[in-house]
């Protein structure tokens, strides 16, 4: 067996660590991407009864972006198990309490119908910001590409770039913008 084939085989059977930046990403679109790596769907040895998934580290879950008015319309259900223990929490309230919970529930729900999803969720590591412990970062070997590009905010662009940006119209100096 050649060295290249041997390395490819090791990579297939080993658990790889991936990192994913959730900044300005839709958690439900991101959950589909993360699910493929957690379950090992991208590996040639995948089988539903085979536990061949990888570890995924999600950073900046505080910066997720829900589409439209999902923050005020999406409701999460929880039951304590006691009579009258049902509670419904809005997405923005849940995100305020725990910035990782909306993303965690999105990934959990994307694996619907999988009997091993509770065990699989143990390989998901969530962080509200980019402060990740060093022992976890040492294991990371791959970065998952985000489906959306992150737009640059106007207040983060330096003045020199703004002044050199081409103008569509040159207004006269005495023109008043209303």
From Swiss-Prot:
Gene3D superfamilies: Ribosomal protein L13. GO terms for cellular component: mitochondrial large ribosomal subunit; mitochondrion; ribosome. Pfam families: Ribosomal_L13 (PF00572). One of its GO terms (biological process) is negative regulation of translation. Keywords: Mitochondrion, Ribonucleoprotein, Ribosomal protein. SUPFAM superfamilies: Ribosomal protein L13 (SSF52161). Disulfide bonds: none annotated. It comes from the Eukaryota. It is found in: Mitochondrion. GO terms for molecular function: mRNA binding; structural constituent of ribosome. InterPro entries: Ribosomal_uL13 (IPR005822), Ribosomal_uL13_bac-type (IPR005823), Ribosomal_uL13_sf (IPR036899). Belongs to the universal ribosomal protein uL13 family. HAMAP family: Ribosomal_uL13. Component of the mitochondrial ribosome large subunit (39S) which comprises a 16S rRNA and about 50 distinct proteins. This is Large ribosomal subunit protein uL13m. It comes from Drosophila melanogaster.
